[in-house]
């Protein structure tokens, strides 16, 4: 210690070793759970069978047992879709032309005992202007576009500045709901996936109610919604302010449109024995106020089988608070799968382990890593120490492993292998 205090390099070196040993110890004491869903979200940017097989082999070796394949995103499908073609939209992502990656993902995953969930961007259609391709969804159906109050009468289709300049379609429009329902039905009928994971199952994000321009930042001011609401309540919602008695009804009108789609998707999935999960924002008040996502209602009515909230933090205490928020507001029948963002945020191995430990302490039903592109070998190694696979090795530091050289304590690590779980 005295040497380390005098020598900065020694101090840094021994501190680093101490952290390494602490991380190793932490990863080996977290119990393995054979019943737990261990998943990862994947944007499938792989264009041949061998590449897909290599990814699945790597995941299988790391203990992953569920994959969430981004199948419908930015308003396009990775597979050749009859529904997309029927509506006059782009039949398939151009990069996959002549190739059906979804079929390969599902077949090869199942060969390895891995379940496949369809990651589905419900009301989000990407951030490319509709003007750039006549077959984009909002180029074919501009009347499906969602609008904020501040630009409700604009001739230009609105995008959400706070969400990567992305475009959204209108949950209130029955044509939108019918299209999305048909697309989900096609996927389920043709591919028999194990699950559907609804993402962007909400309105675009508005400001928080604490800001004076909250009402102007709200979304949902489409021609269809305004006319329907006026028929129901006798007032155009664009005339409402947050202090008006009917503001709560306008808020409920929009959140109910999202809930209705979740309900229909739940009925579809249940009839086909397909698991339905939804990506939610764990802070319930914020989810309702800024995204009109009434996930407590979905859970209370058993419209979904589980939630996959993203915990957008590397801090385990923040993640724990968010886990507790969801646990307080969901029903017992709705499973909770922790969506861990640590790898995407380039957090430390210990950050990842602490959040996994917290999820298991609260007896959550599983963990999902966001996302595969950021799941580097260091993280995989951490998971395979035991967190995602049964422990087969022990790392024991004994007195004989400690040697003293010139008054300096050093460790000689010994690996003692024995099967701890038969």
Task: Name what the model sees in each region.
Residues 35-38, 47, 118-190:
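Active-site-adjacent "subsite" loops/lids of carbohydrate-active enzymes
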Residues 1-65, 69, 409-411, 415-421:
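Mature N-terminal, pre-catalytic/accessory segment of carbohydrate-active enzymes
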Residues 62-97:
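Aromatic-lined carbohydrate-binding/catalytic grooves of carbohydrate-active enzymes
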Residues 46-62, 89-112, 256-263:
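Aromatic- and glycine-enriched glycan-recognition loops and surfaces
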Residues 77, 211-347:
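Glycoside hydrolase catalytic-domain groove-lining segments
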